[in-house]
Amino acid sequence: MYRKIRPALIFHYFIKPNIYGSIAASVLKIPSIAVVAGLGYSFSKNNWLQYCVLKLYRLSLRSNYKVWFQNSEDAEYFLREKIVSKEQLTIIPGDGICTNTFKPVYNKMTVAKPFTFIMAVRLLKSKGINYYVKAAKMLQEKGYEVECQLIGPFDINHPDSISMNQLQEWQNNDPIHYCGFTENIKAYLASCDCLVLPTYYPEGTPRSLMEACSMGLPVIATDIKGCRDIIQDGFNGYLCTPKDGLELFHKMEKMLLLQPSERMAMGTNGRNKMIEEYDIKKLLIIYQSAIDSFINESQVEKIQTA
């Protein structure tokens, strides 16, 4: 396809296109930009798969025009492993968020029963769903009137997917309400009090965090790369240790015991952060700037070789 179309510049996204697409573009001498949106499941364990992917990244990205990263820690890792150079590297604000679309619904920030937590993820074990379930059960056992919603699609072909039987067991025995998959996450965010993301998956910039913050919701997330770029502990939410259901319970308890005005202040801080740092308009400027720079460099190169 690349040979037939001969594009002037190619953007690649996700692991396979970043690797195979970059190699194909390099063979055809077509400049390309790889967008690394997190390291993904292959980097969740230090094993042969991670080793192979590292080798492929090192082979494929070395000739890229630019390599973009959604968080600073992934960028530092690729630099340390000598996969990319400083000249190639750019850090972008995730996928960007349309803050005009994801807007707060302030009238629901009154004291409401039950207090509603929401977790919106692909149903993978490494997203920390079982720790969310444990924390929800502890809240229930302590007598809190809460609703803990879970939203997201099954990925049955993924090696890390939870089973339908496991989900059914959680719903039968624990205070988890599975809402299925929705195209309209805004409606759920508008009716809840706090978003929870206890992930230990190698994230880029979790979109669910950006959506929740943009809508003025406080957030509880794990203290891992990607999440801590968005959430500042005590400022727009709380951070907790990965794979620690007890600490997650304490942070969820702390959140629901806050005054509504305190949660609203956290939500306002999060929305301001989205507007200032992650708005989609800022990402589009980065794209336009990269294209303009490429065009200018190409024109200079043509003049020099003429």
What are these model-derived regions, one by one?
Residues 12-18, 36:
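Short His-centered aromatic/hydrophobic patch
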Residues 58-104:
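Donor nucleotide-sugar binding/catalytic pocket of nucleotide-sugar-dependent glycosyltransferases
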Residues 108-127, 133-136, 149-151:
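Conserved donor-binding/catalytic core segment of Leloir-type glycosyltransferases
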Residues 120, 147-162:
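Glycosyltransferase donor-sugar binding loop
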Residues 152, 161-181:
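Nucleotide-activated donor-binding/catalytic signature segment of Leloir-type glycosyltransferases, i.e.
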Residues 218-221, 231:
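Short hydrophobic beta-strand element within catalytic cores of glycosyltransferases
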Residues 232-234, 238-245, 254-260:
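Conserved acidic donor-binding segment of nucleotide-sugar-dependent glycosyltransferases
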Residues 247, 254, 261-277, 283-289:
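A short, well-ordered alpha-helix in the C-terminal region of glycosyltransferases
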